[in-house]
């Protein structure tokens, strides 16, 4: 009898497992973001034209995106939540209802990132049925037509006493270098505009130097300073040793971009685009390595920033110990996500001696909604002006399916779309344009997509897994030449970062399949040139492997660290117990690296919610 029971139990468990896998295969179909499942292959398949291998579901999603591009005001909106469409179909001819509704915002003048109180009164018929379709939109400039709002909120999400004829909420506003106003809409039977708020302006609206950040060039005597204003001028940085006069001056260049510069919808539509202002870029030269400098940026006759400071780079080969931070997949989420990450990394710089950081792709999650770039750049500014903010490219900066001729990375066709992957439309048509114009990385590859630099005892190599990385591709050829030229007597530590992971215990089927192809293409090179550490993101979690090669723990392998929990929604996929996985946790946090000397390096994972180090490993030569 017991044997029969065991057999029945075994069959039930087997049936449940089969159902679970079947459901998983259905859930992670393309268009949801995890792609189509194909059999593992022993070789990397050549890249094909996109439409040669799209299955029916992905083709339908592509058609839907292209159809939306033809409609005014129906662009896909960022992550509110992830890839949510605008609250109504078209907001073109909204009627103004003659009502007593009042919408007001206070104060009417606000700093960048300042809080305002938005209040509404006398909403007609405040019942759940009629008010469930109410929404409030932000328009900048205030003269924008009703189909050109830059952000929106459902009233049911904002109001604590919903439904009611009145309500209020505190919101953070970001300086978009023009005036703004809010409008209250209802969409019960058709779109009606119930009320328009007073106008809001920003302190030093167009002159305010915004979004300041630093970048290394690979030369310890240099530092790059970048920022944004609403006015065009000769960008100027005054700098000097802290404690003395800022008696050195460097001038630079400026650039900007338009919605028409981007590859596809919604990014290239006018409906949710904000003029990014003038993006200024100044190179500081003649710096002493590993020295504290103070600086300010602006232009004579215009407003300057407050005085900031940074520590210049450590000269390559110097055995001075240093610390840096690495993370991926940030966004602008509430604690313990992005906002906590930003606050803790600022403390790392100010209190713990961190002098540099690397963001491994998926930066703002704007996905075509320009206002999210304003939000995210403002979030990182308090610490990106204190230490170089080096970046890599993720799928949400780069992936596109149309308009490839506008891709500033000059990827052929409409980008990288291998038949075995889930490369699609994840940038919302941005195709790298915002990040290319906002961040200037070292110019020894195809920056900001792939490049390298040296800092002290470490050689850093940054790759793009959103571009062709297979054998024979320009990036693959560059990588081999790049790693073969590293002088390990000068920079004994070799660290590679890219967005997508080779190793993950999470069961996102096609992302895992992509990882297998990355392993096939890149792992032999990493093993040949004895890469010490590979740091990645994409999966929104934390995981560390053993020294691994070809899925086996070996003494001469490479440690892979997945640190994709800087802020975006944490993953929820099942996790399998692979032998190469040494630590896994579903937590927000970031990586901290201490380069002690030529023979010892410490990796630590710092958990956001309590700032505890929950995983660490020493690497030795």
Task: Describe these PLM feature segments.
Residues 2-126, 130-328, 350-351, 586, ...:
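Acidic, histidine-bearing metal-coordination/catalytic regions of metal-dependent phosphoesterases
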Residues 202, 206-574, 580-585, 592-621:
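Metal-dependent phosphoester/phosphodiester hydrolase catalytic core
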């Amino acid at each position: 009898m017991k044997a029969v029971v065991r057999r029945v139990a075994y069959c039930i468990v087997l049936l449940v497992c089969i159902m679970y896998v079947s459901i998983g295969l259905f859930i992670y179909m393309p268009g949801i973001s995890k792609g189509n499942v194909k059999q593992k292959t022993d070789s990397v398949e050549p890249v094909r034209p996109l439409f040669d291998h799209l299955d029916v579901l992905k083709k339908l999603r592509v058609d839907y995106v292209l159809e939306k591009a033809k409609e005014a005001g129906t662009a896909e909106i960022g992550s509110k939540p992830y890839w949510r469409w605008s609250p109504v179909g078209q907001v073109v001819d909204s009627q103004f209802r003659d009502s007593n509704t009042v919408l007001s915002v206070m104060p009417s003048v606000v700093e960048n990132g300042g809080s305002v109180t938005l209040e509404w009164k006398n909403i007609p018929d405040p019942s759940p049925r009629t008010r469930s379709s109410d929404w409030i939109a932000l328009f900048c400039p205030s003269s924008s037509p009703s189909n050109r709002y830059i952000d929106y909120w459902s009233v049911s999400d904002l109001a604590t006493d919903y439904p009611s004829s009145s309500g209020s909420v505190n919101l953070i506003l970001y300086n978009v270098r023009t005036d703004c106003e809010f409008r209250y809409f209802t969409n019960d039977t058709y779109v009606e505009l119930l009320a328009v708020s007073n106008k809001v302006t920003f302190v030093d609206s167009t002159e305010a130097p915004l979004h300041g950040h630093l970048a290394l060039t690979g030369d310890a005597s240099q530092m790059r300073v970048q920022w944004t204003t609403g006015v065009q001028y000769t960008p100027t940085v005054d700098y000097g040793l802290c404690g003395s006069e800022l008696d050195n001056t460097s001038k630079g260049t400026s650039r900007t971009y338009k919605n028409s510069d981007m590859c596809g919808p919604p990014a290239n539509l006018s409906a949710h685009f904000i003029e990014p202002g003038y993006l200024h870029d100044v190179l500081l030269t003649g710096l002493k390595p590993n020295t504290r400098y103070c600086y300010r940026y602006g232009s004579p006759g215009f407003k300057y920033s407050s005085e900031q400071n940074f520590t210049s780079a450590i000269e390559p080969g110097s055995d001075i110990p240093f610390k840096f931070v690495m993370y991926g997949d940030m966004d602008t989420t509430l604690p313990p996500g992005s906002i906590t990450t930003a606050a803790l990394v600022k403390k790392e710089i100010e209190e713990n001696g961190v002098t540099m950081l690397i963001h491994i792709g998926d930066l703002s999650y704007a996905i075509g909604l320009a206002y999210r770039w304003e939000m995210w750049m403002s979030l990182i500014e308090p610490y990106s002006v204190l230490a170089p903010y080096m970046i890599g490219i993720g799928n949400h900066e780069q992936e596109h399916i149309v308009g490839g001729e506008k891709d500033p990375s000059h990827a052929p066709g409409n980008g990288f779309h291998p038949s075995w992957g889930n490369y699609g439309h994840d940038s919302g048509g941005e195709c790298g344009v915002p990040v290319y114009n906002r961040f200037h990385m070292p110019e020894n590859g195809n920056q900001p997509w792939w490049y390298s630099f040296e800092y002290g005892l470490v050689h850093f190599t940054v790759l793009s897994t959103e571009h062709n990385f297979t054998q024979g591709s320009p990036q693959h050829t560059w990588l081999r030449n790049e790693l073969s030229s590293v002088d390990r007597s000068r920079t004994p530590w070799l660290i590679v970062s890219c967005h997508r992971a080779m190793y993950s215990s999470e069961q996102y089927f096609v992302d895992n399949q992509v990882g297998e192809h990355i392993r096939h293409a890149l792992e032999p090179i990493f093993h040949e040139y004895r890469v010490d550490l590979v740091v990645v993101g994409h999966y929104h979690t934390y995981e560390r492997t053993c020294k691994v090669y070809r899925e086996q723990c070996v003494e001469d392998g490479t440690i892979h660290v997945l640190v994709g929990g800087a802020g975006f929604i944490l993953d929820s996929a099942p996790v399998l117990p692979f032998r190469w996985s040494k630590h896994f946790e579903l937590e927000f946090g970031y990586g901290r690296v201490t380069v002690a000397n030529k023979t010892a390096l410490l990796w630590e994972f710092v958990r956001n919610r309590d700032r505890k180090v929950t995983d660490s490993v020493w690497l030795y030569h």
